[in-house]
Amino acid sequence: MNHSRSHALFAQAQTLLPGGVNSPVRAFKSVGGEPFFVARADGPYLFDVDDNRYIDYVGSWGPMIAGHNHPAVREAVEQSIRNGLSFGAPCAAEVTMAQTIARLVPSCEMVRMVNSGTEATLSAVRLARGATGRNRIIKFEGCYHGHGDSFLVKAGSGMLTLGVPTSPGVPAGLSELTATLSFNDFEGATALFDEIGAEVAAVIIEPVVGNANCIPPQAGYLQHLRTLCTRHGALLIFDEVMTGFRVALGGAQAHYGVTPDLTTFGKIIGGGMPVGAYGGRRDLMEQVAPAGPIYQAGTLSGNPVAMAAGLAMLELVQEPGFHTRLSEATSMLCEGLEDAARAAGIAVTTNQVGGMFGLFFTDDVVESYAQATACDITSFNRFFHAMLQRGVYLAPSAYEAGFMSSAHDEAVIEATLAAAREAFADVAR
């Protein structure tokens, strides 16, 4: 593939943007090489500035569950912008969005719109601290909840990709208020609550870890956390920025049958536009300003164009059988990848929940952060580049989940697996 225009753009970008990108994982530092620059996207495909086409399993890191540039979403945006780009005042679409989320998600009686997943998690934790009168939070190794200071302790996503355990610039006093647990560790959670439970405002968790690749919860684990939080008077926050409306219509909480006190959202509810939200029990959400004393605000929150895009996307995912078909397509991909690796003599296992998946270069079932970080990263990096050269774009880090869309039909998946068979053979050499 020719990447001359991408190469020139990246060289220019590095003189203007830190690392040449506006989000670290995009720079390919984990996998090596240089990123390609995207010119357009359609369906399951990305097209770069050098006119190369890629089957895309990143999907803008999750939002594009119906594929890129879906006509219904595009038309909703085009219609909305005819009426203006931003009002800084209430609009009807905000109400419709809140109604939709509240109807579909078990935990959400009220909703507040924000502009990103990071804003959502920061706001949810502030609400938890204000509502409980406590300061400490518990998070999990490898889970990423945005770049808020409280969350950059043993975080996943770009932090894990770059091998940074805790970011410089986070005051020690603040990081000391964040306790960490190993995901899927029942005994560790019980012991930590026995030690500090009376000080804990909230437990925040990705119910399916998507920022240390894809790690599902063991049977009963989320309910165990629910029980501990209730017993000790702490709030349970599900970060469903990735899992919301993807692993099931009602998110991971509906899929696993565990209802948190608060939930954070992003990605799919914006249809590709910048957006976030948090919601939960009415008695908690009514403590948010101006109804209550816990302050949170945003100039562009509830932006009408973002609401239009998100509502169009949520209409698509409510179509009968949408999530069943998405899960079946993801299973087809994962089973095919394992078969292709096995044929090449490569140790690979996959995890899948609905339309999320993870690819691990190991023989073991991966159920924890420690297992994810023990996988063969060198082989993953070689596989990543072998697939990229064959026109398949996977997440450029061994520590990021993959995302399926409804635009990935059987022919697209078969083309992916044909590329994978060749790529695994390259890795085996």
Swiss-Prot record:
Subunit structure: Homodimer.
Pfam families: Aminotran_3 (PF00202)
Keyword Cytoplasm: yes
Taxonomic path: Bacteria, Pseudomonadati, Pseudomonadota, Gammaproteobacteria, Lysobacterales
PROSITE patterns: AA_TRANSFER_CLASS_3
Entry cofactors: pyridoxal 5'-phosphate
Pathway in which the depicted protein is active: Porphyrin-containing compound metabolism; protoporphyrin-IX biosynthesis; 5-aminolevulinate from L-glutamyl-tRNA(Glu): step 2/2
Cell membrane in keyword set: no
Any GO molecular function: glutamate-1-semialdehyde 2,1-aminomutase activity
Cellular component aspect of the GO annotation: cytoplasm
Catalytic activity, EC: 5.4.3.8
Superkingdom of the source species: Bacteria
Keyword list, A-Z: Cytoplasm, Isomerase, Porphyrin biosynthesis, Pyridoxal phosphate
Record's subcellular location: Cytoplasm
Protein name in the entry: Glutamate-1-semialdehyde 2,1-aminomutase
Catalytic activity field: (S)-4-amino-5-oxopentanoate = 5-aminolevulinate
Modified residues (N6-(pyridoxal phosphate)lysine): 267
